[in-house]
């Protein structure tokens, strides 16, 4: 599938999901059980404070120790792209980031680093989003991603068109990478 076909498919899917949003929300709100008793790899939790919802979801998935082993270096990459206060919900919720950091450390992580490549001024984004303060208070190291010097070239031998990429050193030096986007439900998402 080429990029144009992918974008068309994505647009049609988005339109269908917008029309069927209420049906999709009904599906997500259902109480489902793990009838087979196997390992769960997807959990949807709705309603409540972000940190409580995360605790519930990670417990359903077997706990953070399923993903973090003692001594590992962890990168938590939230969305800190915008110079917005938490009340505007433009970035990942700082309470959620703090809870994930705490859970990683409780599972035995050697260190947890939090960073994002921001769209607005990184220092304002980190501060005004509340994520810098929350992450540090939870025990994480916070680092920027705005300088080219943070990125190292990586070969992509199986790439069809892209044969190399520059990857942030925090990711290259980590054992575990946790992406924590902000969930969006607007048409631009």
Language-model features, listed with the residues they occupy:
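N-terminal and secondary-structure boundary signal
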Residues: 1-189
């Amino acid at each position: 599938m080429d990029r144009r076909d992918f974008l068309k498919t994505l647009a049609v899917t988005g339109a269908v999901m917008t029309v069927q949003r209420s049906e999709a929300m009904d599906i997500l709100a259902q109480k489902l059980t793990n009838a087979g008793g196997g390992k769960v790899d997807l959990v949807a939790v709705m309603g409540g404070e972000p940190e409580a919802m995360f605790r519930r979801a990670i417990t359903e998935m077997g706990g953070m120790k399923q993903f973090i082993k003692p001594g590992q270096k962890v990168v938590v990459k939230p969305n800190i792209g915008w110079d917005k206060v938490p009340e505007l919900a433009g970035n990942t919720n700082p309470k959620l980031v703090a809870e994930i950091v705490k859970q990683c450390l409780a599972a035995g992580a050697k260190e947890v680093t939090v960073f994002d490549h921001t769209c607005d001024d990184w220092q304002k984004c980190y501060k005004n989003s509340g994520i810098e303060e929350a992450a540090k208070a939870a025990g994480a190291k916070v680092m920027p991603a705005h300088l080219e010097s943070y990125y190292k070239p990586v070969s992509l031998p199986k790439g069809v068109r892209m044969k190399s990429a520059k990857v942030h050193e925090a990711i290259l030096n980590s054992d575990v990478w946790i992406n924590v986007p902000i969930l969006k439900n607007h048409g631009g998402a």
